[in-house]
Amino acid sequence: MDEAFRFATSEEQCEALVVAGRALKYLVGEAQRLYLEDSRPWVIGYSGGKDSTAILQIIFLALLATPKENRHKSVYVVSSDTLVETPLVVNLVKGALLELNEKALDLDIPLTAHHVVPKSNDSFWANLLGKGYPAPTQTFRW
């Protein structure tokens, strides 16, 4: 069975979609403007959730729309494995990072995705149970 996509190109997608009340084309253009503003590398946090996926999509489209000669700085996508998620979620995130690296390489986009894991003595469970840290809440984070 052949896959059917709603949009034939990323340009068509940017023209048609609205995100948080703004045209996707505008958000991609704003990300592109910020990318070209200086030479400092970017580090993007990625959890695999809807918010970080949307941000990553906007940045990827901005880099894709940037002429190759202007893709002058690196973008690092970092996904931190908290060792709390289920194997299914961890594998989905790892798969997304692998696909992202492959596509960025194919399209000559200066973006690399990385999966990081804490040392065992710095894991969520070691901090919570071993060191006695209080559990994170909406108003308290480690």
Where in the sequence are the language-model features?
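ATP-dependent adenylation/nucleotidyltransferase module used to activate substrates
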Residues: 1-142
